[in-house]
Design a protein with these regions (language model features):
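Conserved beta-alpha junction segments in alpha/beta enzyme cores
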Residues: 1-168
């Protein structure tokens, strides 16, 4: 999920393939990302902001094809491993977000961390989907990184055996 966004052309290409392979319509798929500003450039995504040569865009388009194929692979793997699950929700709390337009705690902010928990019928944790209302711009370098959301995912996965954590 370490992308700044999901280009509509990617959504269309992946959705068409999944519908063709499995009969699952686009409206039944959810595409999400962490909106990290340390993610890769994608085709048809903020190109007006990037001063890149055509050879660079060729690399971006090649990467986009690889990414599309990997997303399709992940969806296929998930569909091949469908199991009954229990879903539950909760809210955590985190205190580092701030309103950049009204700093010093004066502006509106949301410190809640909504969580969707996915567990087996026996209660074994299988996955977590969570969010936080804070822009993924805490880092300031040009290397691929999930920013704070990516580190949170790694921490959650490291603390639990065989789970997938996703920031939304």
């Amino acid at each position: 999920t370490d992308l700044i966004g999901v280009p509509i052309k990617m959504v269309e290409a992946v959705s068409q393939t999944i519908e063709k392979q499995h009969g699952i319509p686009r409206k039944s798929l959810m595409f999400t990302c962490s909106h990290t500003h340390c993610g890769p450039a994608l085709d048809h995504m903020l190109s007006f902001m990037l001063d890149m040569q055509e050879a660079d865009w060729d690399q971006v388009r090649a990467y986009q094809q690889v990414l599309n194929a990997k997303v399709i692979q992940v969806i296929n793997a998930a569909l091949a491993d469908l199991k009954p699950a229990q879903l539950s929700t909760g809210n955590g709390n985190c205190q580092f977000a701030a309103n950049r337009r009204a700093p010093k705690g004066l502006g509106p902010y949301d410190h809640q961390v909504p969580v969707l928990k996915i567990a087996s019928p026996e209660g074994k944790l299988r996955g977590l989907v969570f969010g936080y209302a804070c822009h993924n711009t805490t880092l300031s370098f040009y290397q691929w990184c999930g920013d704070y959301a990516g580190f949170a995912q790694l921490d959650l996965e490291g603390g639990h055996e065989d789970i997938v954590a996703m920031f939304h």
